[in-house]
Each structure stands twice: as structure tokens, then as C-alpha cells.
Design a protein with these regions (language model features):
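N-terminal charged helix/coil linker that caps or initiates catalytic domains
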Residues: 1-46
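Short glycine/serine/threonine-rich phosphate/pyrophosphate-binding segments
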Residues: 54-59, 80, 144-150
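Glycine-rich adenosine-cofactor-binding loop
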Residues: 42-63, 69-74
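Glycine-rich phosphate-binding loop and adjoining beta1-alpha1-beta2 segment
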Residues: 13-14, 67-110
């Protein structure tokens, strides 16, 4: 049987092998969106408010897209009742803060990521102290309708 050129790693010239860890991890993102987008993702700061059912999946998708900095805001701990819908809910994570568990997952996916863990609820009265000034984007994954409405209003006033 003849070896095909792509069947053996020895066929690839050493100088063409990319040794930059970020480039290796996020090469698929570069192929889809281009180099400028990858660099923009790498320097972006995204805040996710609420890291439960919607937020946990969002956080992982952002980390897997090469986002450089995440701020995670939530006061809840992982509960056994979260197992059916929340990414971070596993036997070994029950009882731990959700933001802490997700921060660990993000660092395992992307070792160079910066994750700010804010173990607190976002409320109408504390948004200014919770949401960082340098945030580029904000994801609303809040359960509380009152807090959600306050966050929307706060964001509209800010930008």
C-alpha cells in the first residue's frame, strides 16, 4: 500500500508546523473568520452575567472561540438539579460556585485566557460595581426579570 502525502506526520516539513499554542487551538476560527477576527477575539473582554443554563454554554463557546478575557458574574453554586441543563454540573462540581467551576473549564480549554470570577448576583443596585469599565461585550443570561430589566436599562444608558 502506498502512503498518501497526508497520511504521515513525517511528510509535513518542520518549518510549516505552527508551534504557537493559540494558533494551534484556534486555527479553525482563523479559517472561518480570518486572522483579524482571531486577533479581535483574542483581545476582547466579554462579561457574562448569569452562568446557569444559558450562561454556562455561552461561556464555554466563548472560551472555545478564543476570547481573551471573560468576567463571569453569578452567586449560585452548582446543584444536582442543574445536571440536566448546565454544562458545569457534574458529580465532582456539586456544591461549588458556578463561576469557579466554569473558570477552571475555560483555563483548561484555553490556558492563556484571563477569567475574572465575580461570585455575586447582579442586582439593580450593584451593576455599576459589577460590570467592568473595559468590557467590550456583555451577555445577559440572568434569571431574574427585575435584574434583567435593570441590566438592559443600565446598558442603554452606558452605550
Amino acid at each position: 500500500m502506498t502512503d498518501l502525502p497526508f497520511s504521515s506526520p513525517a511528510v509535513v516539513p518542520q518549518e510549516s508546523v505552527d508551534t504557537d499554542d493559540h494558533a494551534l487551538r484556534f486555527g479553525g476560527i482563523r479559517r472561518l473568520y480570518g486572522t483579524r477576527a482571531v486577533e479581535r477575539f483574542r483581545t476582547a473582554h466579554v462579561v457574562v452575567v448569569g452562568v446557569g443554563g444559558v450562561g454556562s454554554w455561552t461561556v464555554e463557546a466563548l472560551a472555545r472561540s478564543g476570547i481573551g478575557k471573560l468576567t463571569l458574574i453569578d452567586l449560585d453554586d452548582v446543584c444536582v438539579s442543574n445536571v440536566n441543563r448546565q454544562l458545569h454540573a457534574l458529580d465532582g462540581t456539586i456544591g461549588r460556585p458556578k463561576v469557579e467551576v466554569l473558570a477552571e473549564r475555560c483555563r483548561a480549554i484555553q490556558p492563556g485566557i484571563e477569567v475574572v470570577e465575580d461570585i455575586a448576583f447582579a442586582t439593580p443596585t450593584n451593576l455599576a460595581e459589577r460590570i467592568p469599565e473595559d468590557a467590550d461585550h456583555l451577555v445577559d443570561a440572568i434569571d431574574s426579570v427585575v435584574a434583567k430589566a435593570a441590566l438592559i436599562s443600565w446598558c442603554k444608558r452606558r452605550k
